[in-house]
């Protein structure tokens, strides 16, 4: 799997492409490690480093011979240099691959940093949206409450009618208070009249009792006088 980055509308977009391997990923790692160590481009054949070693060994052995073998030494030296040149090409390719991998890694890190930045920005935007949502909910609730109050107010009668009703009620209350005051005064007057009547009744009753006592005393006195006269006549 390889990761590539491309810029679309001012932002980096990560493109992931899937590669189908002929070997298991674990085997791939072993093969790649072996190729990097031996500089081989295929899994078959003799490693270039070993071939270079053989060429160098053949050249050294030929040089160590105590014979006039300049032609063979030249031939082996030329073969060794050719093999060395052939071995250098994969090294340059590997170096180019390493540099490309480093550039790709750097690009991947940039994409990663940009992605993390975008994630953090998205999280911040989500938090802001959450706050805005809560604020909008509160505003909506306030609007609904205001609408409910407005409906209640609109359902009430006009102010002029209310003031008229209040005026009529105050007038009725004043009349009731006046009637109550008049009733209280009349009640007080009736209380005083009743008290005076009771006093007069008491005086009449006392007078009648006194008159009855006087009448009884007069009758008793007349009876005694009559009795005395009768007694006197009897004695004569």
Swiss-Prot record:
Keywords: Coiled coil, mRNA processing, mRNA splicing, mRNA transport, Nucleus, RNA-binding, Transport. Its main location: nucleus. InterPro entries: THOC7/Mft1 (IPR008501). Residues 99-228 form a coiled coil. One of its GO terms (molecular function) is RNA binding. It holds the Pfam family THOC7. Belongs to the THOC7 family. Component of the THO complex, which is composed of THO1, THO2, THO3, THO5, THO6 and THO7. Acts as a component of the THO subcomplex of the TREX complex which is thought to couple mRNA transcription, processing and nuclear export. This is THO complex subunit 7B. It comes from Arabidopsis thaliana. The lineage of its organism: Eukaryota, Viridiplantae, Streptophyta, Embryophyta, Tracheophyta. The gene is THO7B.
């Amino acid at each position: 799997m390889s990761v590539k980055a491309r810029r679309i509308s001012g932002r980096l977009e990560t493109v992931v492409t899937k590669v189908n391997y002929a070997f298991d990923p674990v085997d791939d790692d072993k093969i790649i490690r072996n190729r990097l160590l031996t500089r081989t481009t295929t899994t078959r054949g003799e490693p270039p480093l070993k071939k270079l070693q053989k060429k160098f060994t053949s050249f050294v052995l030929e040089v160590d011979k105590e014979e006039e073998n300049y032609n063979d030494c030249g031939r082996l030296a030329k073969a060794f240099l050719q093999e060395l040149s052939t071995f250098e090409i994969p090294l340059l390719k590997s170096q180019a691959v390493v540099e490309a991998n480093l550039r790709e890694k750097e690009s991947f890190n940039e994409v990663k940093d940009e992605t993390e930045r975008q994630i953090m920005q998205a999280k911040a935007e989500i938090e802001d949206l959450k706050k805005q949502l809560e604020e909008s909910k509160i505003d909506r609730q306030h609007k609904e409450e205001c609408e409910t109050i407005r409906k209640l107010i609109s359902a009430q009668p006009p102010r002029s009618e209310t003031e008229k009703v209040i005026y009529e009620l105050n007038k009725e209350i004043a009349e009731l208070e006046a009637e109550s005051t008049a009733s209280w005064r009349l009640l007080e007057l009736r209380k005083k009249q009743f008290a005076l009547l009771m006093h007069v009744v008491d005086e009449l009753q006392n007078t009648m009792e006194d008159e009855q006592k006087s009448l009884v005393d007069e009758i008793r006195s007349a009876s005694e006088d009559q009795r005395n006269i009768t007694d006197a006549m009897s004695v004569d």
